[in-house]
Curated annotation (Swiss-Prot):
Keyword Lipid metabolism: no
Listed cofactors: [4Fe-4S] cluster
Residues given in the record as S-adenosyl-L-methionine 1 binding sites: Y54, G111, E144, I328
Gene of this entry: hemN
Pathway where it operates: Porphyrin-containing compound metabolism; protoporphyrin-IX biosynthesis; protoporphyrinogen-IX from coproporphyrinogen-III (AdoMet route): step 1/1
Coiled coil location: none
Biological process (GO), any one: porphyrin-containing compound biosynthetic process
Binding-site list for [4Fe-4S] cluster: C60, C64, C67
EC number: 1.3.98.3
Transmembrane segments: none
Organism of origin: Cereibacter sphaeroides (strain ATCC 17025 / ATH 2.4.3) (Rhodobacter sphaeroides)
Keyword Metal-binding: yes
Protein known as: Oxygen-independent coproporphyrinogen III oxidase
Record InterPro entries: Aldolase_TIM, Coprogen_oxidase_HemN, Coproporphyrinogen-III_oxidase, Elp3/MiaA/NifB-like_rSAM, rSAM
Length: 452
């Protein structure tokens, strides 16, 4: 049996599994954990330890058909201005519970499209955030940027407020692919955006690509990657397109007949990995690449790579505070998601309530399983002695799961004398499926994306 046939027989093209950007995955969250938990977790923060802050801006001028994010379209700035006002109100609510002296080691603006904000709104929001949670000395402020919705005044405003990393969504530069996903973005506009960012001192650059898009093939993806390499990013993420029209209604606009088949998707992923590694990048986890001197590559080599809701990260802050509709916070005590619908979120804030509406309170077992899965996702191994050192006898519950994974996914898993498990390079496409063996929660597969 060929390697690809063996991968296929193990369910590579059929399984739907979590991306494990959190553990447990978000579908496990419960309405039993809400605003009271949110307030208590914020009040328990240690001012001596910097936190990460995520700001969600759920607006776009145009809705890309492939996107499954919580976003809404608007052709005017009025709802955006109103929403920023609500963000400022939420910050004031958070401030009531926040211990004095808490600082932000990381600040990330995502969406939607944060660059839909005008320069005036950029300044207003950034200054309000810093008034409540000032930057730590060695901070990172990153912003997701749409090259078609940004100009020099916006970049200048972001730079003046401290942005030092930009993340540019690209997906694919091929005209027919862009037309099929409702996203027009010429390479020239993207290159001009990058040049302007660098002119304003933003030298750390991430780019996002997607494989498995309609009409995409090896030639078109290779041409896109060639152009991306010309931009000189420090990091690249390339995600598999998840076609879930039953969850993301706008995906019904995509013609399923021109989507690459499973084998073609697999070949596209392998092509991207080959081109980026040959282009001087180190492979990070299952879908990221970074220059050897980038902090993410350094973290990966030193065993400090972590997972969060943006994917892989070198962020060492133990707390993520989410601000805005649908944003998710991660506290030592567990996870908390803000009300997802923008109107309901605004209503909660206007009533003077913290907007947390569902979450999960972590147990000792959750911490153990979560760390085991994070090891697998970040390092392609499970270090059993390290789990024993941290969790004591409870780590022994991983032994039968290691045995199960080794039997189910042979010959792609090896187990050493210490009981630690490693995934061979040829089997790393199965990583999410292997991680699921260590997931103690049973959730419907329909909630998740394809494993490959």
């Amino acid at each position: 049996m060929t390697n690809i046939a063996l991968l296929q027989s193990l369910g590579l093209f059929d399984a739907r599994v979590p991306r494990y950007t959190s553990y447990p995955a978000a579908p496990v969250f419960s309405g039993a954990v809400g605003a009271d938990f949110q307030a208590q977790a914020i009040e328990a923060l240690d001012p001596a330890v910097p936190i990460s802050v995520y700001i969600h801006v759920p607006f776009c001028e145009r809705l890309c058909w492939f996107c499954a994010c919580r976003t809404q379209g608007t052709q005017t700035l009025a709802p955006v201005e109103a929403y920023v006002g609500t963000l400022l109100q939420e910050l004031e609510l958070v401030k009531k519970h926040l211990p004095a002296g808490v600082k932000a080691g990381r600040l990330h603006w995502g969406g939607g499209t944060p660059t839909i904000l005008s320069p005036e709104l950029i300044h207003k929001l950034a200054q309000a955030i810093k008034a409540v949670i000032p930057f730590a000395e060695d901070y990172e402020f990153s912003v997701e940027i749409d090259p078609m919705m940004v100009d020099e005044p916006k970049i200048r405003a972001l730079s003046e407020e401290g942005m030092n990393r930009a993340s540019i969504g690209i997906q694919d530069f091929t005209d027919i692919v862009q037309s099929a996903i409702g996203r027009e973005q010429p390479f020239e506009n993207t290159r001009a955006c990058v040049e302007t960012l660098r002119r304003y001192g933003v030298h750390s650059l991430n780019t996002d690509l997607v494989y498995g898009l309609p009409h995409q093939n090896r030639e078109s993806l290779a041409a896109t990657i060639d152009k991306v390499l010309q931009l000189g990013p420090d990091r690249v993420a390339i995600f598999g397109y998840a076609h879930v029209p039953w969850m993301a209604k706008r995906q019904k606009l995509i013609d399923e007949n021109v989507l690459p088949n499973d084998m073609e998707r697999h070949e596209l992923a392998n092509l991207a990995a080959k081109m980026f590694t040959e282009g001087g990048f180190e492979r990070i986890g299952i879908d990221h690449f970074a220059r050897p001197d980038d902090s993410m590559a350094v973290a990966a080599r030193s065993g400090k790579l972590r997972r969060n809701f943006q994917g892989y990260t070198d962020d060492t802050c133990p707390t993520l505070l989410g601000i805005g509709a649908s944003s998710i916070s991660k506290f030592e005590q567990g996870y908390l998601q803000n009300t997802a619908a923008t109107a309901a979120y605004i209503k909660a804030i206007e009533e003077g309530r913290l907007p947390g509406y569902r979450g999960h309170r972590m147990t000792d077992e959750d911490y153990l399983h979560g760390r085991a899965i994070e090891m697998i996702m970040c390092e392609f191994r499970l270090d059993l002695p390290a789990l024993r050192a941290r969790f004591g006898e409870a780590a022994e519950t991983m032994v039968p799961r290691i045995t199960e994974a080794a039997a189910k996914f042979a010959p792609f898993i090896t187990v050493d004398e210490a009981g630690s498990m490693s995934i061979e390079a040829e089997g790393r496409a199965l990583t999410r499926m292997i991680a699921r063996v260590f997931d103690a929660y049973e959730t419907p597969e329909a909630r998740y994306s394809q494993a490959s």
